[in-house]
Amino acid sequence: MLPSTIQTLTLFLTSGGVLLSLYVSASLSYLLYSDILLKFSSTKRTAPTMSLDCANVSNVQAVNRSATKEMTFLLPEPEWTYPRLSCQGSTFQKALLISPHRFGETRGNSAPLIIREPFVACGPKECRHFALTHYAAQPGGYYNGTRKDRNKLRHLISVKLGKIPTVENSIFHMAAWSGSACHDGREWTYVGVDGPDSNALIKIKYGEAYTDTYHSYANNILRTQESACNCIGGDCYLMITDGSASGISKCRFLKIREGRIIKEIFPTGRVEHTEECTCGFASNKTIECACRDNSYTAKRPFVKLNVETDTAEIRLMCTETYLDTPRPDDGSITGPCESNGDKGLGGIKGGFVHQRMASKIGRWYSRTMSKTERMGMELYVKYDGDPWTDSDALAPSGVMVSMKEPGWYSFGFEIKDKKCDVPCIGIEMVHDGGKETWHSAATAIYCLMGSGQLLWDTVTGVDMAL
């Protein structure tokens, strides 16, 4: 017996007496998805011209061999992405290790690329693991110079998250010694910076097309955030900065839509030095960023950007848990929240990600276990409160990388589940071979899942002497 939900569609195609009947079965289903309405576009398709050999075929009187018919189909358009509530969980666990140089004896196209500054960005269907390569592999004969931050060979590359960034796996997006990327729900936006220190250039690529540029405004190493930009409703927000590594470096935000810059945002507040921000959505209205001050303080500059008004303000985090490296003892900086304290010269990019819940918000941070060296990485959390005014200590939540292992840059990102977003933090674990040999990185990833305590730290398993 046929179900009552079966509909019969009879399509008559008449071409010299040809009659075809098509029966299409359709079941009805309904999907409630985050209050976002699925949009449809009307797209015309033309049936291809076919040459039909109808010899010895009964019930056919005549055939027009060049007949074409126009049909209109309704095809769904991909939706812009919006931040959603985080998936349930109360702790982070080790999710993934990408340690390319465990395969360092492999040669040819399967050889691992020499990389640094890795980060992850996610679209609705996949996450991609990005990095900046020196256009060299290990093993190989081009190790010299792979410890340098900027040169003419560096490129922004990516692989699907979980793949090893080898020569054959990697997509080379553009020449760049600083980079970012994000997905607006329909397409990838890629950002790369290169050029001379005194006149660097930001380049933007949307899908496969190179779409826009932005020139240096302080003529002192224009650079971007080395982590994912953030998109909402088709608008993507990118942090950039330009200025001295040991002095003034004022940041800006670029509002980008379909690969083209549509607005510049100039933050107010404590703007002396802000770089390498790790940003995410606190809500549908606000992007928050934990950044690096390489000149004046071990506190993190904290940005709040209102996406409704396109305004941004920066203040220092007030917590007595100082997140930069090097840093003084926790709680040792006296005075108001805007006090710089000592040991402010130098710094490191820090991990930061939001846990959005119906009744509260969690802010997760990472910092090195060492106060002076890029060694180890620990996870911290603070629920609710205001990072600008809350002086309480952050709660330690587990060791992701022990003091025996390298912990360099860290970053945040969110994986798109069917109905919620999974917050994650990634850690760059650098194999520092000095100037004489290769200099590259592994990536450790921890994500919110389940309850209990963070159970295990990560090791790279790489011996550079082998």
Swiss-Prot record:
GO cellular component: host cell plasma membrane; membrane; virion membrane
Record keywords, A-Z: Calcium, Disulfide bond, Glycoprotein, Glycosidase, Host cell membrane, Host membrane, Hydrolase, Membrane, Metal-binding, Signal-anchor, Transmembrane, Transmembrane helix, Virion
Cofactor: Ca(2+)
Regulation: Inhibited by the neuraminidase inhibitors zanamivir (Relenza) and oseltamivir (Tamiflu). These drugs interfere with the release of progeny virus from infected cells and are effective against all influenza strains. Resistance to neuraminidase inhibitors is quite rare.
GO molecular function, one term: metal ion binding
EC number(s) from the headed UniProt entry: 3.2.1.18
Reactions it catalyzes: Hydrolysis of alpha-(2->3)-, alpha-(2->6)-, alpha-(2->8)- glycosidic linkages of terminal sialic acid residues in oligosaccharides, glycoproteins, glycolipids, colominic acid and synthetic substrates
Residues noted as binding Ca(2+) in the record, renumbered to the chain: D293, D324
Intravirion topological domain: 1-8
Protein name: Neuraminidase
Native organism: Influenza B virus (strain B/Hong Kong/8/1973)
Phylogenetic placement of the source organism: Viruses, Riboviria, Orthornavirae, Negarnaviricota, Polyploviricotina
